[in-house]
From Swiss-Prot:
Residues 733-893 are annotated as: 6 X 4 AA repeats of P-X-X-P. It comes from Homo sapiens (Human). InterPro entries: Cadherin-like_dom (IPR002126), Cadherin-like_sf (IPR015919), Cadherin_CBD (IPR031904), Cadherin_CS (IPR020894), Cadherin_N (IPR013164), Protocadherin/Cadherin-CA (IPR050174). Potential calcium-dependent cell-adhesion protein. May be involved in the establishment and maintenance of specific neuronal connections in the brain. Glycans are attached at N265, N304, N547. GO terms for biological process: cell adhesion; homophilic cell adhesion via plasma membrane adhesion molecules; nervous system development. One of its GO terms (molecular function) is calcium ion binding. Residues 1-29 form the signal peptide. It is a single-pass type I membrane protein. SUPFAM superfamilies: Cadherin-like (SSF49313). PANTHER family: CADHERIN-87A (PTHR24028), PROTOCADHERIN ALPHA-11 (PTHR24028:SF68). It is found in: Cell membrane. This is Protocadherin alpha-11. The gene is PCDHA11. The keyword Glycoprotein applies.
Amino acid sequence: MFGFQRRGLGTPRLQLWLLLLEFWEVGSGQLHYSVSEEAKHGTFVGRIAQDLGLELAELVQRLFRVASKTHGDLLEVNLQNGILFVNSRIDREELCGQSAECSIHLEVIVDRPLQVFHVNVEVKDINDNPPVFSLREQKLLIAESKQSDSRFPLEGASDADIEENALLTYRLSKNEYFSLDSPTNGKQIKRLSLILKKSLDREKTPELNLLLTATDGGKPELTGTVRLLVQVLDVNDNDPEFDKSEYKVSLMENAAKETLVLKLNATDRDEGVNGEVTYSLMSIKPNGRHLFTLDQNNGEVRVNGTLDYEENKFYKIEVQATDKGTPPMAGHCTVWVEILDTNDNSPEVAVTSLSLPVREDAQPSTVIALISVSDRDSGVNGQVTCSLTPHVPFKLVSTFKNYYSLVLDSALDRENVWAYELVVTARDGGSPSLWATARVSVEVADVNDNAPAFAQPEYTVFVKENNPPGCHIFTVSARDADAQENALVSYSLVERRLGDRALSSYVSVHAESGKVYALQPLDHEELELLQFQVSARDAGVPPLSSNVTLQVFVLDENDNAPALLATQAGSAGGAVNKLVPRSVGAGHVVAKVRAVDADSGYNAWLSYELQPAAGGSRIPFRVGLYTGEISTTRALDEADSPRHRLLVLVKDHGEPALTATATVLVSLVESGQAPKASSRTLAGAASPEAALVDVNVYLIIAICVVSSLLVLTLLLYTALWWSATPTEGACAPGKPTLVCSRAVGSWSYSQQRRQRVCSEEGPPKTDLMAFSPSLPLGLNKEEEGERQEPGSNHPGQPRQPNPDWRYSASLRAGMHSSVHLEEAGILRAGPGGPDQQWPTVSSATPEPEAGEVSPPVGAGVNSNSWTFKYGPGNPKQSGPGELPDKFIIPGSPAIISIRQEPTNSQIDKSDFITFGKKEETKKKKKKKKGNKTQEKKEKGNSTTDNSDQ
């Protein structure tokens, strides 16, 4: 204090330093915590704020923080609860190594006023380090002469932990030669050694593999291992040994010099120089040292002179083997050599007059070559016999002594074997006999006896329609088993007529590569299947050929937009005018948009969407997603606009989808005005009374005609059904073609187009479908029908169906037919018979119930084609007394409903084309008939409304 005054410091500054020093002493208290190493993130260490006497609310305000010089990120404080916790991995061995004490020093600093606290966190050791040896394998070299109880030091393991976790104990794997000596001083091993319990024998056990395991004292225990490889060093304590003590060898008298007589082999179980063996001749009896030699390194005994059977028949050779140890050790054996009298001249073979190559169509007994043999020996040793390679189509025929002919024994096939390597063997009669061989190569010349062959008799190809001209659609390949020009294959079309056009106008085939090209764009709507043949011809003489059938299926693409069908109140694509009474309730069907799509499958599956009104205003109408029926969403009231312009977007399910737009003009009128206005709209400039008379006349005519047809059809069908026997198969020629069907739900007529299937049998054919609806029991007189268009076909004459006739998806799902085809001979005959499906797609399907929608038959399947399906049983057929819900007037867009519905039902009223008249309930119609004066007023109002539209 006085020192500061001597330096000239003023009293105020001195007081400030004293104040700071006082705060420092107050806040410099020290806390102690402990935490185990490797603790997880978030592990609780201590309530540091509580232990320091700090309030939790003031930690943030006073800028509470923790600082450390070296390891500040290991621990962290939660300012919300004042708890010190582990922030990151703590490794004691990394922090403090082998030190007995390990701690982390933290400084806790708070401001306002400034205070510094010292926190000491002790890191406790856990047993997380196993014992580790410095080497994976320790090698020990021990001589086999070492005495028992000999000691061999080992290098111990180390443990990075401390105290009990680093206290190691050792154990040795079980063995009969060594034990482990591990004396301790109470804390750690002083010296680790192996003790030899039993003398080693290198010849029995050249090396030992032991496993030394070190275990620490932690909880749980951790271990470490090292492999001990003990190699036993050799001592020269074994003699060289031969395989046998005596050897017997037979040797020809004409054996040449350096001929190997015998190779001796002596082994010494010692190793190194103690196991190296040298050989030496001790004696040869009778006197024959000049006849044989012995290689001292490899033990080979060889002929060194000329042997003579008549001079000596046996030789006895004594051999010694000596190792290079100190002192050297030796082994002995005896070799007996027998001299044999042999046939020393081999036969000779000569092949002449070869007739090669041989054609594969050569006849048996054809002479291929002449063979002669000879032998310079005499007697039995000079008698020679010949033989040929077995299992070949050739044989040797002896013509006279020592002459043979090589002839063909059986037919040749070059495709199986194109060449033969024959071996002619000549053997004499000596003992042992000598032989000689001669090789004859016989090549088989090819003959064109194999036609080109395709991998399979028929190929199926799928091509998308609208392909570019010259498009490569397939490649045919035929293989000819012959060779050279006989295997050279060229391709061509099997030309024929497809209707009025040649096949070559559709496709072409490259003569060399076999690639098939489409010469023009294919149209799925015109041609679904193109069947033709491709011929493969070789270049042989005479040429051979074969055909393969190609079935080219033209896949549909979405290239046709939906087409709107003409209605009674407007043309296709034009606006349709509809009058709706304001008194109708929710769900009342206002109109129905009909459309067809010339594509197939999903490309022809249509959906309907009502476009939002201009200005975003909400309209009280909706359209069925798959039926096209426009109905009210709620009851109409006076607040609704008297006129609505509805835009219905018709969209198919192709990729990309194509659309069409229909316009429906809806006028809201009073309840009594709708029927009269509809009548005048239908009649146009004609008088209302004349229009109503025409409608009634046409309706009565249509009902009478259809009723007559239904009665006739039902009688004919019943007679055929009961007259048919259960064993009938296909219809005999001359029986009428009959298609009986039953519809479930509403069904309408759609556009029927002619589908051409081009096959190789005759000209293209067009499927003919005939529908014979059942006769209704009675027709409700008050049910409003539809008139039949003038000019309808005569009942006996076929007519192209009206474009407004098409089967709905729900109808197809529930429709089953019994089909009799005269030409194809297909007849339903009990279980297993053909089951006809009607894969057509219609825009006139009714609104599905409970959100169910009848899907299309499937993408790529034409909606107007016939598909015969052979199933395990027959579907239920409609009986003579069962009636369909509706029937169709052929050649007319009229669809007559004979369902018995409630009087107030408005369901499916839009399925009828009423020539501009909206159908009301029967109760409303009766009320309208009773009030003629009100009807005249409605006519005037309807005229005014139509003029406004």
